[in-house]
Amino acid sequence: EIELFPGVEDALKALSENYMLGALTNGNADIYKLSIGKYFEFSISSLEAQNSKPNKSHFELAKKHLPNLKYSEMLHIGDHQINDVFGAHALGIKVLWFNNTEALWEQNFEKPDQFYDWHSLAKIIEEKYESR
């Protein structure tokens, strides 16, 4: 059973109206069996990628679903400093770090933009990324 953070479904619904969303997971849950599954155009699991994030295979498979975009035009949202942030950053993908625990940045590469609450996600993306 997967419990969603407050505001996740509303944020995904709002974002799916303007963006193509994909789920990249190291887990084994079928995103399409969850209430939020309808907002995703594609989902890539570790089984499909034959590896786990931060390995670039997840991100390369996502790119195949987005053939008209460059990595630099993509935005990856994740909560893990290595699996999500480092993995995407290594390919030049913009990253937005979900830091709901207000953890300290412990890596030796650039700290990405961060957010703490899913209710604010759509506004943050609009303010920080739509004009870039």
Mark where each language-model region is.
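Asp-based, Mg2+/Mn2+-dependent phosphohydrolase catalytic module
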Residues: 9, 13, 19-132
